[in-house]
Amino acid sequence: MLKLIVKNGYVIDPSQNLEGEFDILVENGKIKKIDKNILVPEAEIIDAKGLIVCPGFIDIHVHLRDPGQTYKEDIESGSRCAVAGGFTTIVCMPNTNPPIDNTTVVNYILQKSKSVGLCRVLPTGTITKGRKGKEIADFYSLKEAGCVAFTDDGSPVMDSSVMRKALELASQLGVPIMDHCEDDKLAYGVINEGEVSALLGLSSRAPEAEEIQIARDGILAQRTGGHVHIQHVSTKLSLEIIEFFKEKGVKITCEVNPNHLLFTEREVLNSGANARVNPPLRKKEDRLALIEGVKRGIIDCFATDHAPHQTFEKELVEFAMPGIIGLQTALPSALELYRKGIISLKKLIEMFTINPARIIGVDLGTLKLGSPADITIFDPNKEWILNEETNLSKSRNTPLWGKVLKGKVIYTIKDGKMVYKD
Ligand code: DOR
Ligand code: ZN
């Protein structure tokens, strides 16, 4: 029997309201015991003194680019970034080439990620065949094959009747629709519609492109009983709309990309195309509302929207591919809120663990006895720099490149096996 003890760490598990200095005994890949001073002579020991010990992080929004665009990232490099960022489970987006609208692609991803053997990779299927927004994909067989949600991420579903049908089907299958909300008639440009787009003379994306679709899909979720999960929420009004539906008891949840908490549209003036993302970085007022939304629990979880693109695809803002990498920077970014006294570490961990687990309906994100021993161990104060040496992605598109970051994952354990060590 393989035994491991994580000793002397400060354990925080929001799923069972557990917080304090404890040892964790892992046996055969499962959580066996959490107690003070566990002694098992034959067990391997990980000394976590001075470190935070919590359930393995879950990221429900990752672009692995595999199959089809493996020059940007692949399942192996993406998995390496994930475990280095503390994520033991990631949900990958279906805008691959070919897209995940058939079971062959699902099986390929599941097999390859298993053979890489670092983190759990849970695929999503497309809402519509070919992500074309017209014909609904075969949800039933995609779910059977292992998809945990459906999304046309990267593109909105413009046709309301298609979205209604998708929510009806998803409701029958008990899975969420993950919703990239941006009406493409109002969001066709490259950055937020506002002072910076005016200053630089750049084409833009209006905030109401997002808000209108959230309102529509909240109504459709109410009508169908389906669960709509709003991806990368980015404006103040979006949050007000989400709160409205939550108060009515509609099944609506949402995530925030930590980059939207750190930066505004003005970051384009510093980082150029590396600050180009869809939905775009918004105004200060929006950024502050998002932070408030985290604090008040209107936002359910962090999700990185890790979206790798090569440097040649990020030269000019006007022509750049949208997206920012984020698996390795999510924890230090979120810790900024903790350091400013806005949220507790417990709240931060909840948003990386049990909350995303609940959204996709998996029994993970917890250290409950008998659960898979997925454990993240981090130092909230360790400083490091994301650069050539530390970056594990094939891409480097982030405004945080070369910046000093505070907070570092020291060990990541998945199913009782160490998959990352600083
Ligand atoms: O900025 C983005 N990049 N937003 C998306 O929705 C898609 C993603 C990508 O695939 O690059
Ligand atoms: Zn998206």
Swiss-Prot record:
Q: Which UniProt keywords apply?
A: Hydrolase, Metal-binding, Pyrimidine biosynthesis, Zinc
Supply one GO CC term from the record.
cytoplasm
Q: Cofactor(s) for this protein?
A: Zn(2+)
The entry marks the following residues as binding Zn(2+), namely: H61, H63, D153, D305
Activity regulation information from UniProt: The monomer has very low activity by itself. Activated several thousandfold by formation of a complex with PyrB aspartate carbamoyltransferase (ATCase).
What pathway, per the record? Answer: Pyrimidine metabolism; UMP biosynthesis via de novo pathway; (S)-dihydroorotate from bicarbonate: step 3/3
So where's the catalytic machinery, residue-wise?
A: D305
Q: Does the keyword Hydrolase apply?
A: yes
Catalysed reaction equations from the record? (S)-dihydroorotate + H2O = N-carbamoyl-L-aspartate + H(+)
Report the SUPFAM superfamilies cross-referenced here: Composite domain of metallo-dependent hydrolases, Metallo-dependent hydrolases
Which cysteines are disulphide-bonded? none
NCBIfam families from the entry? PRK09357.2-5, pyrC_multi
- Report quaternary structure and partners: Monomer. Forms a 1:1 stoichiometric complex with PyrB. The complex exists as an equilibrium mixture of heterohexamers, composed of 3 PyrC and 3 PyrB subunits, and dodecamers. The complex has both DHOase and ATCase activities.
Q: What does this protein do?
A: Catalyzes the reversible cyclization of carbamoyl aspartate to dihydroorotate.
Protein name per Swiss-Prot or TrEMBL: Dihydroorotase
Species the sequence originates in: Aquifex aeolicus (strain VF5)
Gene this protein is translated from: pyrC
